[in-house]
């Protein structure tokens, strides 16, 4: 006997699988193929939205907007690439609500191919015009990488942070703190060279920002912006 799905169930399945289908298309798309994405806020407007939210958060005046669950189509103002550290929750530190941020997190706020495809999906399919790479004080991944550098036997995650350590070796200040900022800067610069993202950066449709989060104050400091 054939399996029949109610129209509501079928619609939910189609909605849930759409992002997966897009990522598969993106992975095998010919070079130069572009995708039409809905228009969202400009890079400057999106960045200001998040900086205003962080100012509310640090002033203990968070409004917690749009905190209820939603099944509406998503139109995030920004992609956040941040560390998995539990003390760095993007929606809270930016005082944003459900649907406001497209968040990709891993230890050390670097990325691999799978994370990159998620970022490309947000920019190419959802129309997101801003990417913020967030490093933070006391990052355990960077601390571990500094301790392991330059051992070739370190994990791939730690090796991803090695370029930041190499770039800051011998500079004044704390080696770990220096590497934390440099790691965010280099990750943002690497994203800006991605074949799917670089044309949008060049045209001004996309801005990629490196930032650092202060665990004690809750404040975000912009390091660089492409």
Where are these regions (language model features)?
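N-terminal secretory signal peptides that target proteins for export/translocation
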Residues: 1-11
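Short acidic/polar active-site loop segments enriched in Thr and Asp
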Residues: 129
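Conserved functional hotspot residues or short segments at active or partner-binding sites
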Residues: 133
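Short, glycine/acidic-enriched capping/hinge loops at junctions between secondary-structure elements
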Residues: 89-94, 115
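Bacterial N-terminal signal peptides
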Residues: 16-29
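Short glycine-enriched loops at secondary-structure junctions
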Residues: 82-87, 107-110, 136
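Divalent-metal-activated hydrolytic enzyme cores
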Residues: 30-74, 98-99, 108-126, 143-226
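Short helix-loop-beta junction
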Residues: 94-103
């Amino acid at each position: 006997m054939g399996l029949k799905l109610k129209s509501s169930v079928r619609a939910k399945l189609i909605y849930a699988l759409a992002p997966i289908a897009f990522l598969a298309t993106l992975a095998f798309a010919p070079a130069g193929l572009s995708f039409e994405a809905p228009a969202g806020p400009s890079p400057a407007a999106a960045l200001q939205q998040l900086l205003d939210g962080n100012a509310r958060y640090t002033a203990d005046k968070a409004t917690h907007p749009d905190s209820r669950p939603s099944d509406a189509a998503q139109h995030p103002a920004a992609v956040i690439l941040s560390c998995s550290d539990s003390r760095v929750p993007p929606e809270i530190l930016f005082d944003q609500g459900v649907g406001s941020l497209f968040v990709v997190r891993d230890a050390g706020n670097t990325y691999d191919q799978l994370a990159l495809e998620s970022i490309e999906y947000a920019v190419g399919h959802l129309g997101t015009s801003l990417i913020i790479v967030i490093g933070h004080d006391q990052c355990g991944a960077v601390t571990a990488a500094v301790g392991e550098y330059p051992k070739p036997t370190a994990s791939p995650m730690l090796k991803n942070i090695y370029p930041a350590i190499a770039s800051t070796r011998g500079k004044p200040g704390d080696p770990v703190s220096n590497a934390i900022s440099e790691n965010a800067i280099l990750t943002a610069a690497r994203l800006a060279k991605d074949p799917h993202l670089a044309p949008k950066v060049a045209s001004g449709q996309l801005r990629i920002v490196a930032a650092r989060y202060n665990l004690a104050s809750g404040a975000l400091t912009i390091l660089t912006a492409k």
